Amino acid sequence: MKIRPASSSDMERIMKIEENAFIPNIQETYQTFSCRMAAFPHGFLVLEDDRGAVQGYFSSELWEKLPDNNKVFILDHDPLKVHKADGKLLYVSSFALMGSLRGRGLGKLFFRECLKEVQKSATQIDQVILIVSQEWGSARHIYEGLDFKAIRQIPGFFPSDIIPGGADGIVMIKTLEENV
């Protein structure tokens, strides 16, 4: 397995991973992923298996500061409106692995290594923020295992097939040390 920057030729596979990982009402669009890649190429990484097939992706943006409102977290938002090349806050906008790779510890390893890679090209980053659904216990386990702390809850943020009115979004943050 190797981590490398995503390219436009990966988009079809990234969309397959998106469809595999999320229910339809949460899946983000091809256009959104293309904009993320254009806004911050060093912050959009893929996990490639030994055959060269993309099996996971990690997309992120640099923000100036922690937002004081919840609107900036909206799904399918335009990263070009919020990304700041000199931002110190890394927002992980999306992260997913193909289902066949889940449950083996690869998610945590991939996520941690992506943070390290992004930090190499954006050395000013001092905090990482993300939003996760209350329904995604495995994802929360990864983030908590990497010392992310919940700082805010957004009621009904994520569409849900299980929870009427939607699942709460949990905003989590981690302050970075020299070594992630």
Regions from the PLM with identified roles:
Residues 90, 111, 118-134:
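Conserved GNAT acetyl-CoA-binding A-motif
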Residues 59-94, 156-166:
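Conserved acyl-donor/pantetheine-binding loop and adjacent beta-alpha core of acyl/acetyltransferases
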Residues 1-14:
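A short beta-loop-alpha structural element at the N-terminal edge
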Residues 99-102, 128-140, 156-167:
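Conserved beta-strand-loop-alpha-helix junction that forms the acyl-donor binding cleft
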Residues 23-50, 54-65, 77-81:
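Active-site rim helix/loop that mediates acceptor-substrate recognition in acyltransferases
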Residues 97, 103-118, 141, 145:
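Conserved acetyl-CoA-binding loop-helix of GNAT-fold acetyltransferases
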